Amino acid sequence: MSDIEARVKKIIAEQLGVEEGQVTSEKAFVADLGADSLDTVELVMALEDEFGIEIPDEDAEKITTVQNAIDYANTHQKA
């Protein structure tokens, strides 16, 4: 597991109040991990803080799974 993947999974577990072991790449935030719309907004904000990035609303709407979040962080994190 990459450092970014581990950081993303840790943030998701903390934000959604689930065990890190439940946070696997294919899980959807709402359907699988019980997130609501406020949770997803807070999750995006936590990812922005962790990786020093800004996630526009149109991109945030597409981040619906753990893998989406990992891919976005990998692609957009500041060096």
Swiss-Prot record:
The gene is acpP. Keywords: Cytoplasm, Fatty acid biosynthesis, Fatty acid metabolism, Lipid biosynthesis, Lipid metabolism, Phosphopantetheine, Phosphoprotein. It holds the Pfam family PP-binding. InterPro entries: ACP, ACP-like_sf, PKS_PP-bd, PP-bd_ACP, Ppantetheine_attach_site. It comes from the Bacteria. Residues 2-77 form the Carrier domain. The keyword Repressor does not apply. This is Acyl carrier protein. NCBIfam families: acyl_carrier, PRK00982.1-2, PRK00982.1-3, PRK00982.1-4, PRK00982.1-5. GO terms for biological process: lipid A biosynthetic process. Pathway: Lipid metabolism; fatty acid biosynthesis. It is found in: Cytoplasm. 4'-phosphopantetheine is transferred from CoA to a specific serine of apo-ACP by AcpS. This modification is essential for activity because fatty acids are bound in thioester linkage to the sulfhydryl of the prosthetic group. Its main location: cytoplasm. Belongs to the acyl carrier protein (ACP) family. Carrier of the growing fatty acid chain in fatty acid biosynthesis. GO terms for molecular function: acyl binding; acyl carrier activity; phosphopantetheine binding. Disulfide bonds: none annotated.
